[in-house]
Every structure is written in C-alpha cells, then in structure tokens.
Amino acid sequence: EVKQGEIVALLGRNGMGKSTTIKSICGLMSEFQGEINFNNTSLINLPSYKIAQLGIGLVPEGRRAFSNLTVLENLVASAVEGEWDLVSIYNLFPKLEERKNQLASSLSGGEQQMLVIGRALMTNPKLLILDEATEGLSPTIRVEIWKVIEILKNKNVSILIIDKSLKQLLDLADKFYILEKGKTVWNGPSKKLTSTIAQKFLGV
C-alpha cells in the first residue's frame, strides 16, 4: 500500500520478487496471483498503456530512453498536462536542457537515467515507480539522483522504489516491505527496520 505523498520501498535479496511485483503492477506480467488496486480500480488484465493512463509512471531497470529520439522528443513523447512540464524538468535536471537537441543515445549513462526519470515525471503520475534507479551509476550521479528523490518527496509525490542503497532508503522511505519468494515477510516504518531484521532477511 502506498498512500499519497509516501515513499514505500520494496526490499529483498535478488530473485525474491521485487521486480516481478513492479512488472505486475504495470501490466507487464500476464500470470500472477492476487489483487492489484490503484485508486479503487483493479489493474488485473489491464494493458500496460491503460495502467499508465490511470497515473502510474515507471522508471524501469536499465535506463530505457528512446535512443533514436532527442532529449526533448523523449520528454514530450508521452507528456500529460500538469505540474511537471519542461520548465520544471529542466530545473530538476539542468543537463537535460543543455542536451535537449541531442539524441538520447549520445548521453552518458547518468544523463540517460535523468532523462528516463524526467520522461516519467512528464506524465504527471499519481504514483512514480523507481526500479533500481541508481544502479550502475557513478557515485556523483547517484548523489544527484537521491537529491532529486528527496525533492520529489518534499513535493508530495507518491513513490514506490526498489534500490540496494539501504542507507539512503532509511533516510527517505516512510515504509518498507521485505519480500521473500514473492511473499511479504516483514513490513513497517523505517524506524522499526532494525539491523537484526535487515541481517535476517537481507544479509546486510
């Protein structure tokens, strides 16, 4: 469950169902058990584009920018009118404005990740999902992405996040769910996620 303005983190060792959960929410998995509801609407059997139209924005694992489009074309491709527009995205990521006429394929890995986050925000989502948004990035870019996530939190953006950076998650997330073999084995607020629990379920 993710409430308005909350950051909720999914934790678990590799292969325990975190990304599968994300894919199921976004309509990218055809077979799973259980119910998924968003704003009182069942997401079961809905195509992914319909789920996006309901207000779920996904930043997928692996920096999937549209490589044959420019930065600007990427940002406006699926834009929805709202608070997040080109001006606000460029304020968040000044490098994107500098590179707006370049092809996405010419950007560095960190810049591509900024672009994918910006593109998701341009849909003005009610829920933003970040799947390993800082993985494989340089330490400097990771710091920048975490600062952006903090800004989004302060702007009351609802976020569901998967990330291996437990320290940053403990600072920012309101609530945690720990998954093991596709099932929730622990959930609670960050202040109750003790080192004992982390060691038991996460090995950290």
Placement of each model-derived feature along the sequence:
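The feature captures the beta-strand-to-loop junction immediately N-terminal to the Walker
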Residues: L11-R13
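Conserved ABC ATPase signature
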Residues: L103-L107, E111
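ABC ATPase C-loop
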Residues: A120-L121
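ABC ATPase NBD coupling module
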Residues: S30, S42-R63, L86, E98-N101, ...
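Helix-to-loop junction immediately C-terminal to a conserved catalytic motif
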Residues: C26
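Catalytic Walker B motif of ABC-type/P-loop ATPase nucleotide-binding domains
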Residues: L128-E132
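Conserved ABC transporter NBD signature motif
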Residues: G34-S42, L54, G82-W84, S88-N91, ...
